[in-house]
Structure formats: C-alpha cells, structure tokens
Curated annotation (Swiss-Prot):
Function noted in UniProt: Immunity protein component of a toxin-immunity protein module, which functions as a cellular contact-dependent growth inhibition (CDI) system. CDI modules allow bacteria to communicate with and inhibit the growth of closely related neighboring bacteria in a contact-dependent fashion. Protects cells against the tRNA nuclease activity of CdiA, its cognate toxin protein, but not against CdiA from E.coli strain EC93 or D.dadantii strain 3937. Binding to CdiA-CT in the CdiA-CysK complex probably blocks the tRNA-binding site of CdiA-CT.
Coiled coil regions, renumbered to chain: none
Protein name: Immunity protein CdiI
Domain of life: Bacteria
Cysteines paired by S-S bonds: none
Record organism: Escherichia coli O6:K15:H31 (strain 536 / UPEC)
Subunit structure: Interacts with cognate CdiA-CT but not CdiA-CT from D.dadantii strain 3937. CysK forms a complex with CdiA-CT/CdiI. One CdiA toxin subunit binds to each subunit of the CysK homodimer, and one CdiI immunity protein binds to each toxin subunit; the immune complex is thus a dimer of trimers.
Length: 128
C-alpha cells in the first residue's frame, strides 16, 4: 500500500506535539495512511497543500464517482480543491484527471451553485 511517507520519504518531526501547528499534526496523522484510505477531508487538504497531486487522482476519482459533490465541510469541497491544481502537477494520471473532469461536467446545473460553477470552469481550463 502506498502512503505519503513512501512517496515523500521519511520526514522527521522534531517538535513536540504541543508545539506543532494544526497542519503539522494533520500531516503526522495521515503520513502512514494508505492513499486509498484517505478521507475526503484529507484529500482536500492534501490537494490544497500540493502534496502528491498526481498520486491522489485515482482516489479522487473513486470518491467523486460515488459522491460527485463530496466534501467534509460543504458540498463540492473536493471539486473546489481540484480547481487549485496545475496541469504540471499531473504526470502519470492525466487520463484519470480527464475522467474526473468528465464526471464533474455531468453534474446537474441545479446541483451547482455559482462558486462551484467557477471551480468547474477552472478545472476545465487546466491543461493536461
């Protein structure tokens, strides 16, 4: 099973937990979690932090196939996170990203608010 530690390498946290930021605590919590077990919240945060974007795409596709408006804090949060990536972040998973794009473009217009519509437009402009 692939984890962030296997992808990034061994990262030594030198701070005591009470000295760590919430981001550091989160990263320490998920670094050994298999990518296929990451939650929607973890995927959103990892994408926003630009962590292993390419390797996360199969899990993102799996989640969005089951729940196209997946989000921990609001509907469409995962789509919003995807709108922040750059085409160069996608190396081996360009076809997976294309599938993700096709999937979100099939959402019913009545299910999409203005912010989500803007995020989808950004995703459609990502060159792969």
């Amino acid at each position: 099973m692939i984890t962030l530690r296997k992808l990034i390498g061994n990262i030594n946290m030198t701070k005591e937990p009470e000295q760590q930021s919430p981001l550091e605590l989160w990263f320490e919590r998920i670094i050994d979690v298999p990518l296929e077990k990451l939650t929607v919240e973890d995927l959103c945060r990892a994408i926003r932090q630009n962590l292993c974007i390419d390797q996360l795409m199969p899990r993102v596709l799996e989640v969005l196939t089951k729940e196209p408006l997946a989000g921990e804090y609001y509907d469409g949060e995962l789509i919003a996170a995807l709108s922040t990536i750059k085409g160069e972040d996608l190396k081996d998973q360009k076809s997976t990203f294309t599938q993700i794009r096709q999937l979100i473009n099939q959402l019913e217009p009545s299910d999409i608010n203005d912010d989500l519509r803007k995020d989808i437009l950004k995703i459609n402009q990502i060159i792969v």
